[in-house]
């Protein structure tokens, strides 16, 4: 039905400033200076930074995410109001660490629907996969599998089964 539906690819970009703000905003301690100081010889992107790129895309200003995505309809899918969605789970696979800035490169977000599941009166589960890819080389940097739950928006007659996955985190150790 709607499983496998692919949204149009979208460009993503970031600056070193974005990487620094992210590391500071999630409370990286000073002991991990290689995430917090852009002149550190091993300066690198914190591994979970790719999780925000589907929200940020190329914006350098505050993002009104819901307005931007209001027209992202999925053929045959129920009309869910994603303003009420909450994170259910995320699985992040890192194939290659992101560079500290996307300047000089071109990256894109490829987003597809794994499934939308009717959970009855409780609501619906929305399962997606986001891939960050170098648009020139085709090299995949990260894949994120996200399941969001949309409360009180169920009973639309869709499939009820959601396959539960195990979440694995692998962090890259700075070299040097």
Task: Describe the function of each predicted region.
Residues 1-8, 86-176:
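HotDog/MaoC-like acyl-thioester-processing domains
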Residues 1-106:
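Hydrophobic, proline/glycine-rich low-complexity stretches
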């Amino acid at each position: 039905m709607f499983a496998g539906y692919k949204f149009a690819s979208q460009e993503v970009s970031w600056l070193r400033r974005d990487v620094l703000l992210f590391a500071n905003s999630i409370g990286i301690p000073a002991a991990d200076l290689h995430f917090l100081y852009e002149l550190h010889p091993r300066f690198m992107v914190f591994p979970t930074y790719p999780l925000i790129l589907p929200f940020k895309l190329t914006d350098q200003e505050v993002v009104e995410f819901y307005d931007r995505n209001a027209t992202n309809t999925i053929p045959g899918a129920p009309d869910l109001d994603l303003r009420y969605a909450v994170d259910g789970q995320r699985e992040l696979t890192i194939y290659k660490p992101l560079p500290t800035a996307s300047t000089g490169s071109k990256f894109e977000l490829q987003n597809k629907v794994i499934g939308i599941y009717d959970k009855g009166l409780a609501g619906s589960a929305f399962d997606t996969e986001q891939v960050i890819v170098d648009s020139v080389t085709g090299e995949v940097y990260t894949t994120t599998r996200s399941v969001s739950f949309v409360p009180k928006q169920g009973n639309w007659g869709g499939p009820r089964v959601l396959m539960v996955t195990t979440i694995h985190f692998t962090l890259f150790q700075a070299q040097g």
